[in-house]
């Protein structure tokens, strides 16, 4: 995981936010295709819906938020832009392994921030803490 303030670099060039977004989106698409889901991408991103998943004759809308920075040593904060997407998919790297957190968007069309704890907090607090491991089940996992 990259610390706050450090960019993502490739061959000596910092990767743009747009490029990081495409990388995150491809991580999610790869995961969904391996699960045998049908995945569709809108031509434009006017409504902040990155993917449409067809699964069991249902459509599920997804916004992808690729996260490469830690807000402190053990958690990340994800800023969600106003979207009508049902789910927020958040690819993250924990101990050199990539996971996708799936967060149900219960605040549609509102801007908000949600925090996820990536490791045990120093104060051992567990109440009202979003541990990333609790968000690894995708909406197509039965």
Which stretches of residues belong to each language-model region?
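Mixed-charge (Asp/Glu-Lys/Arg
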Residues: 1-47, 52-142
């Amino acid at each position: 995981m990259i610390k706050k303030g450090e960019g993502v670099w490739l061959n000596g060039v910092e990767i743009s936010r747009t490029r990081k977004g495409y990388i995150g989106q491809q991580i999610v698409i790869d995961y969904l295709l391996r699960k045998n889901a049908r995945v569709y991408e809108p031509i434009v991103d006017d409504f902040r819906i990155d993917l449409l998943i067809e699964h069991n004759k249902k459509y599920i809308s997804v916004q992808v938020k690729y996260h490469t920075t830690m807000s402190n040593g053990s958690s990340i904060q994800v800023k969600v832009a106003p979207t009508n997407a049902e789910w927020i998919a958040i690819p993250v790297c924990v101990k050199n392994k990539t996971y996708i957190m799936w967060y149900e968007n219960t605040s549609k069309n509102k801007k908000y921030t949600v925090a996820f704890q990536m490791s045990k907090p120093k104060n051992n607090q567990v109440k009202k803490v979003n541990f990333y491991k609790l968000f690894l089940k995708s909406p197509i996992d039965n």
